[in-house]
Amino acid sequence: MRSASILSAALAAFAPLASAADAVSGAAEGFAKGVTGGGSATPVYPSTTAELASYLKDSSARVIVLTKTFDFTGTEGTTTETGCAPYGTAAACQVAINKDNWCTNYQPNAPKVSVSYDKAPFNPLIVGSNKSLIGQGSKGVIKGKGLRITNSAKNVIIQNIHITNLNPKYVWGGDAISLDGTDLVWFDHVKTSLIGRQHIVLGNGASNRVTISNNEIDGSTSWSATCDNHHYWGVYLTGSNDMVTFSKNYIHHTSGRSPKIAGNSLVHISGNYFYANSGHAMEADAGAKVVLEGNVFQNVVAAMQSGLAGKVFSSPDANTNAQCSSYLGHTCQLNAYGSSGSLSGSDTSILSSFSGKNVAATVTANDAKNVPNTAGFGKI
């Protein structure tokens, strides 16, 4: 009995100690207001990649705390095959994996190239309902795999982690965070970097109520579809019935899809800092209803791609912005531009779509100027 007690004490000495930092910080604003994730479940501390995958996928309510880097690189082997180079063969250009015969069907005239890629990002970590995934301090890193929330999973919080290194050289190399068929999802203070395909993707099924806040979408890369060290595949919001709050995020060194919105998506974009975009930031295509307010566009060639069919209210002037108060609960705030193109769109007909819904509090462009200092991993 005494030896068993000694063993138990020894094991306890090496177990991670729970702290106040091992709980969700703050609460979601906007459409995902009320999300609780794993709630008051006792925190668990995965020590292996297999244990992390198991905790995320199971049916229990969980608070999962990451205390180190979980590196999936090479865990499922690599593949060498023929891909294509639709954007050119220069060293700074992304080349493409022939995923689902994409090269064959859509880029038949592109030069054929050999591609060697890691297989792990093609099998993302599946996240079940009632989960909080939290990074401890600046330690919670997932390398070589993204997260996928799908199959009616709901009530999920992802906070203070860094997802990185998903075959960044290759189009179709992997998505960092993907949602399809969900409800009540909040990801906050997450950094994504060196991603092959989308940093964030919602669709094609309904993602319903989602809040994306205080994240850093880092598009800096050595390989891009625009061959200029700016990642093109940023944020893709095209779910069939989505309400998305996109607030206080830092999106930088991208060249497109920052974000792209279509499907059937009601989106509130407020208080974000868009920086160093070599192409265009927002795309609003058919099915998009978008309000943009209190954002900063700094060194963005085009704040918005023109000629698309989405409905946009860009908070164009103080008088028009006052109409927001009846529907969003506050007067919409002007956006700010520095060495950038400007937004267009003053479709007030979409404002009523926000009436009676959980809308995030107003943020001014002056507030948004500090977002690069507060958004992302390790900044809670």
Curated annotation (Swiss-Prot):
GO molecular function: pectate lyase activity; pectin lyase activity
Main EC class the enzyme belongs to: lyase
Highest taxon of the lineage: Eukaryota
EC number in record: 4.2.2.10
Glycosylation sites: 130
Cellular compartment(s): Secreted
Catalytic activity: Eliminative cleavage of (1->4)-alpha-D-galacturonan methyl ester to give oligosaccharides with 4-deoxy-6-O-methyl-alpha-D-galact-4-enuronosyl groups at their non-reducing ends
Signal sequence interval, chain numbering: 1-20
Alphabetical UniProt keywords: Glycoprotein, Lyase, Secreted, Signal
Pfam families, per database record: Pectate_lyase_4
Gene Ontology CC terms: extracellular region
Family of the protein in this entry: Belongs to the polysaccharide lyase 1 family.
Name of the protein described by the UniProt record: Pectin lyase
Source species: Colletotrichum gloeosporioides
Gene: PNLA
